């Protein structure tokens, strides 16, 4: 099933495109020569990005849950909630950390998380950020990004199909071959 055409208001991304973006981001970080100790991804949007990158770089993955897009069916940014704890596979958050998310939109989340990490985790010696998309109106600048979007399109990521899918709908979904 093909995606609708993208325009200034909507950017449609399929699974293959999504994974190529993660690979391009990983290559960009690698080619920068920066050596980091851990990846910290922001859940939920950065989880897939962080998972793939932690496998490529063979470094521990930490997950920090954040949430601000709850209103208007997840399309309007509200107050930011940052989880009290970080889940990490080995050790604690320290040293050189690569903060990963799917995008920097307004930049508010990135700036608040950056401040939170610096205040709560003094063992972090260097913090850099990597995203797939950097929106032009953002107040924050990521260290690494794949696409800078001068406009402010809604990015339709491939996993958004699951946002409206419920367990009782799975059988029909599978039979239909919806993807």
Regions found by a protein language model. Give the residues of each.
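PRPP-associated nucleotide enzymes
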Residues: 1-179
